[in-house]
């Protein structure tokens, strides 16, 4: 007798219960339920986004293996959150798209079959879009305003302005989020749109497969049929002459047909080594939109929104603490939140700065720089007195030293923003935020200041304390 999805999930849970610790099973496995089982695809529903992410990353493959042992054939396990399924239930077949980055076709025959398939089904199953990467989940700040506006513009009117749209920025700053948001937006407006989201690696692998299987025409037909193509991590095309050649012709075919092209990279076209000049020219002919690292206020807004999406009550001082600690990219910031939530969920300890700080400190030792030490060393390097730094003096030298002191105190101690303000003569927490932002900006353009700040950090051994 064939098992229903619920029956299969019950058996899988029973098998897992004997192999997992009780806290792990009770926290992650038991709350999940089976929402569907068809076409060898078992779809599980977790109570929230955090739980679904955790279950997907850590246990989906194990669940699939156990299920295969029970029913005797391989299955695919999909893990969604309650809000994902709510969003999918009344939408397009995009809900069946896997978030894995699978090649568009494993053989030339499959590629040819896919080209001949009705456009109402194949294109919507191709993108591999993450359902969380939509515009209303993207926090816009000064660092990303232009890129966000351009992405929305091409999503609303593809192939008109900004073609191609080239989004560049460092790792974890939101490039992929914006690209996939464009794809979601187009599919929402036009469910029949042929939207392709691929990484450069996938494009290269598909090309290699097509060459080996004598399927170049099917490969070209498939990619050039796109109404909207989103190509991620184009920097990995460097030095791949044949891939660059094929992408050049694909680009021209799509652009000449008025199809929208969106490209993402960790650097501008002109800075990608061993990239053909004609590709640099093509990539630069539309709009190059840069995304910078978010400032403190934007990081706080990102954390707040993420916490709301995950239905997590996050104390404001903890938001301030995490935002001040993790400054380089959004992925790192959200990773810190994930660890904090996991820590609280597993241990049952409420999330506070005091409880979370030791766990977030990479050294596992905590940070033991004192506020007084920061003031003393900053005073020494910047040639001002400790009293000057605590005063209301607006002399440039004093003001700069005070801002650096606030910046380093945020990095080297566990003090909240209001506490840091109190240390500097009762300054408001907004003054501290402003000081941190100013130092962050100046460090990128002022080598002398960067050298002075590093000198203070060396004296305080802030970096070595974190590495221990």
Curated annotation (Swiss-Prot):
It comes from Synechococcus sp. (strain CC9311). Plays an essential role in the initiation and regulation of chromosomal replication. ATP-DnaA binds to the origin of replication (oriC) to initiate formation of the DNA replication initiation complex once per cell cycle. Binds the DnaA box (a 9 base pair repeat at the origin) and separates the double-stranded (ds)DNA. Forms a right-handed helical filament on oriC DNA; dsDNA binds to the exterior of the filament while single-stranded (ss)DNA is stabiized in the filament's interior. Disulfide bonds: none annotated. Coiled coil: none annotated. GO terms for molecular function: ATP binding; ATP hydrolysis activity; DNA replication origin binding; lipid binding. This is Chromosomal replication initiator protein DnaA. Residues 1-86 are annotated as: Domain I, interacts with DnaA modulators. Keywords: ATP-binding, Cytoplasm, DNA replication, DNA-binding, Lipid-binding, Nucleotide-binding. NCBIfam families: DnaA. The gene is dnaA. It is found in: Cytoplasm. Residues 345-468 are annotated as: Domain IV, binds dsDNA. InterPro entries: AAA+_ATPase, Chromosome_initiator_DnaA, Chromosome_initiator_DnaA-like, Chromosome_initiator_DnaA_CS, DnaA_C, DnaA_dom, DnaA_N_dom, DnaA_N_sf. Oligomerizes as a right-handed, spiral filament on DNA at oriC. Domain I is involved in oligomerization and binding regulators, domain II is flexibile and of varying length in different bacteria, domain III forms the AAA+ region, while domain IV binds dsDNA.
């Amino acid at each position: 007798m064939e098992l229903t999805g619920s029956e299969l999930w019950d058996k899988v849970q029973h098998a897992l219960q004997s192999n997992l610790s009780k806290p792990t099973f009770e926290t992650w496995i038991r709350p999940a339920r089976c929402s569907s089982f068809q076409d060898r695809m078992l779809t599980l529903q977790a109570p929230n986004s955090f739980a679904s992410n955790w279950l997907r990353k850590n246990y989906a493959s194990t669940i699939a293996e156990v299920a295969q042992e029970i029913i005797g054939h391989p299955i695919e396990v999909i893990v969604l959150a309650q809000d994902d399924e709510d969003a999918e239930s009344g939408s397009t077949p995009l809900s069946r798209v896997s978030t894995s980055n699978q090649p568009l076709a494993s053989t030339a025959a499959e590629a040819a079959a896919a080209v001949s398939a009705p456009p109402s089904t194949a294109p919507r199953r191709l993108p591999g879009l993450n359902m969380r990467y939509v515009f209303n989940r993207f926090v816009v700040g000064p660092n990303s305003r232009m890129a966000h506006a351009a992405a929305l513009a091409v999503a609303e009117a593809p192939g008109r302005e900004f073609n191609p749209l080239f989004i560049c920025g460092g790792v974890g700053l939101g490039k992929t989020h914006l690209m996939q948001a464009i794809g979601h937006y187009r599919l929402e407006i036009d469910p029949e749109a042929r939207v392709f989201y691929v990484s450069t690696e996938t494009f290269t692998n598909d090309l290699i497969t097509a060459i080996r299987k004598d399927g170049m025409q099917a490969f070209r037909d498939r990619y050039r049929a796109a109404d909207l193509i989103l190509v991620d991590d184009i920097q990995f095309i460097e030095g791949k002459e044949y891939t660059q050649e094929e992408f050049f012709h694909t680009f021209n075919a799509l652009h000449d047909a008025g199809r929208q092209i969106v490209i993402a990279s960790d650097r501008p076209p002109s800075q990608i080594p061993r990239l053909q000049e004609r590709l640099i020219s093509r990539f630069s002919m539309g709009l190059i939109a840069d995304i910078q690292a978010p400032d403190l206020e934007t990081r706080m807004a990102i954390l707040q929104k993420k916490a709301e999406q995950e239905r997590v009550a996050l104390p404001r001082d903890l938001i301030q603490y995490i935002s001040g600690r993790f400054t380089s990219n959004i992925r790192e910031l959200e990773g810190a939140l994930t660890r904090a939530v996991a820590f609280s969920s597993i241990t049952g300890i409420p999330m506070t700065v005091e409880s979370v700080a030791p766990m977030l400190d990479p050294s596992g030792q905590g940070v033991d720089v004192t506020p007084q030490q920061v003031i003393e060393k900053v005073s020494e390097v910047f040639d001002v007195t400790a009293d000057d730094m605590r005063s209301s003096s607006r002399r440039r030298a004093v003001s700069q030293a005070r801002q650096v002191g606030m910046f380093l105190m945020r990095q080297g101690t566990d003090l909240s923003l209001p506490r840091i303000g109190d240390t500097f003569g009762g300054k408001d927490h907004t003054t501290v935020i402003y000081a941190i932002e100013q130092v962050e900006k100046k460090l990128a353009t002022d080598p002398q200041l960067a050298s002075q700040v590093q000198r203070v950090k060396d004296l305080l051994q802030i970096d070595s304390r974190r590495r221990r």
